[in-house]
């Protein structure tokens, strides 16, 4: 078998047999971190189990890197889905992406998950992690994937595949008895996923459409070590203490009313005092820094915004025009044109 030249970032170029995997290189090459969970081949995020068939650049990454952490999070979503299927076999799986420091998976379940259910799911995830199941990826044609997921009655996967081009080549990932449709990449085995926590569950609509089936969305997080996990969970606890929704209710600052509209707070006397104090502080800081305040109308002729160019770019996100004596007026969406008018009102040297 012929050899290929692999340029390993931080180490240099070395020859390997054609078909070698990054995982084999990681195991056999001095200087490559054993904490690596994924890699980039010629800049493309790739499974450690992928075969290298030509000369390439290779970069290994652990879960502390942004790309590595995204792979760990996504792999943990699959781990959770497998645990859910073991505990609740009638569940239908949908999608499970990663977010910033978190992941979620949407499930079609008979009854919403309780706190006790989440604890059971997390415990089952620990068991699957301890089983250290190899995570294997396969490439399937559209028809092969359709046949497979139709046979195991995963209707949402069938719907996703049906929406793809007929010539689409698909990847599936398997760990033990669980197989999911996914672009990947993933960690090499479930045993790598050790430090995770399920955070919450809530309702969600399939494909974010309220006319579709209501699903159960479970959020979680996952890190390379226990220290980073605890640090993140502590940060979440601190955020909860400072949540404006919690503080606003506890201090009786404001509330919302459906007849007024979403995102339009009604400030109570306590809230009004807070606003006055914040405005006074802002004025004090601005004055100390040499700024002068002006005030401009809340309504403006559309002509001004047309002249400034704002109307052309922002009309879709502005309140509709109000017809006053045959002239279009708009709620003020930006200050710049008015400030230009004030500046131009007096001669400047």
Regions found by a protein language model. Name each.
Residues 1-101, 120-127:
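Ubiquitin-like/PB1-type beta-grasp interaction modules and other compact soluble beta-rich domains
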Residues 50-71, 92-96, 104-349:
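Auxiliary tRNA-acceptor-end handling modules of aminoacyl-tRNA synthetases
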